[in-house]
Amino acid sequence: MRFCEGSIETRVPSFDGVPLDVNVALPADSVADAPFPLIVRMHGYNGTKDGPYLGGDRGPSTYTMYTDAGFAVMTFTARGRGASCGTDASRRATPEACARGWDHLGDARRSIRDVQYLSGRLVDAGLVEPAIGVQGGSYGGGRGLLLATLRDRIQQPNGHYTPWTSPEHGIDMEVAAAVPFIAWSDLTYALAPNGRALDYAIGSDTLSRAPLGVLKLSIVQGLWRQGQAHYNAPPKSDPSIDLSTWFDAFPSTAPLTETSRHAAREFTRHHAAIGVPLDRPPAPTLIANGFTDDIFPVTEALRWVHRVREAFPEATIAQLYGDFGHRRANQTSAALLAPRALTWFQRHLQDAEASAPAGVEAFVQSCEGGFGARHHADTWRELSAGELRLVDSTGTTVRSDAEHRRVSRLIDPPSGRSPEIPSSSCRRAHRAPAPGTASYTFAPVGRTVTLMGSPTIVATVTVRAAHHALIVGRLWDVDPDGKTRTLITQGIARPPSAAQETGGATPFVLQLYPNAYPLADGHRAELQLLGRSTPYVRPPTDPFEIQIERVDIRLPTVETPVKEPAGKDQNAAAVSVPAPRVLPPDMRWAPGYDPSDR
């Protein structure tokens, strides 16, 4: 390949003059063969143009995977990081240009505009085609999904959308292929979920803010610590990205403030694909999220897919899910994603007859290392055919002060960095008692059952709280001896505000993060509901109690209902026909889920 490496001295001024540190790699072919199809690779939150990228790529391998296949590749350090005004040295070199070159955390009006402007410069130079590809993970993935959804539009500083054209010659441009992985679609919901998202329904545009959710504290604290190395806007200096103020603006149980509402609006409207108006289909997108990624779970992908499919049923989307992503995930996505990404770009940027991914691929979690069985279907719904179901009306109370702290720390996603806690998606813990929490234990399964999808809890609750309450759900795999259990998945929600206002019993639907998990013969599923989970969830500042009067727990399975043969344990948990889904009054069915269509 031919490689142009940027430096502080050769930075490229962006659309607003902020200097950006850029690398460009071209295939070894003659320049006479230009223009080449371009792939923009975008780094993660704590990275720079040098990576790390997918699979920990740094150095030449960042580029050669694609340049060897005839693509041009551009990488650059996002504004406010590294030599793009992030270091003291870079700001001293160009103090005026860097004065407001702080981190904008994927804002479509600036961070995304940088990608569009830089690639437009290469188009104007005649080096690359105006239909580009984008790829990135985590922070790069969130930006990639936003670019795919914008497709051929720019979001101006005033929030309006205009056609995307190259800066000098006005050539029409678009994203023609995107591979975002372990990404968010709604940054507000990803970092502070309220539990209203359902994998079979679509909510209003304010779903993630009504009510405002509960902060994933250990995650956001970790990001904030890493972000101290960036150039951040001084407090109160930029209302579009006031991170230092916003960090404390997501309370757990205290009253909400206008600052918290403003932060949530900014994140959803300008930092997230879910906030982009869908007046055209997105670019062909291969989206990949991790079942065991407790930062950006599969929920983030499904919300975007359902929204797009509702508006554009024929949109080109492929989905890939498995045990990869941010901790506690096993972080081994390269073997799955790299070859699929290459064929995706070959198909959509080079018109090659490549066998590109299609439909939904889901790999079962394996505690033995690597990936478990592969399942494929045309849609998310078709991956599961039955369910394990448990209904309990005995009633119990969940308190805001109750948890087993050691267990909570053990399953906290970033805790895998600690020497005493293995970095594994299969977090195991003793079945420690925790008074003030609720547990619901299924009968043991009589054969191995593959859980596939989002565990669903339909509950009737009464909340007693001065302001707000929260609830954490954990689904466990309990060993046959009943002493040890493995975390399958978890989730966070706010119980309905109506219950807080009236003190009366209110129906509530909560889904935990989706997973594909093998529940072995003789093992039991166990749901635990708590009022706190420290340090993953910001602890309550005001006491509350949640009276759970009835729960209907549904665990979707790959297996279909079958009549167990004579001699089988008739007390074993059996796969049944899925019960009718419950649609909250402020939501509508996602494509393929409306019972009246069947």
Task: Annotate each predicted stretch with a short phrase.
Residues 294-302:
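Conserved alpha/beta-hydrolase "acid-adjacent" motif
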Residues 281, 287-289, 293:
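Short beta-strand/loop motif that positions the catalytic acidic residue
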Residues 51, 59-60, 68, 83-115, ...:
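Accessory cap/linker subdomain of secreted extracellular hydrolases
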Residues 6, 10-11, 352-598:
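Glycine/threonine-rich phosphate-binding loop and adjacent beta-strand/alpha-helix elements that clamp
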Residues 126-139:
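Alpha/beta-hydrolase fold nucleophile elbow
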Residues 1-34:
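N-terminal cap/lid segment of alpha/beta-hydrolase-fold proteins
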Residues 308-327:
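Catalytic histidine neighborhood in serine/cysteine hydrolases
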Residues 34, 38-117, 121-123, 468-472, ...:
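Cap/lid segment of the alpha/beta-hydrolase catalytic domain
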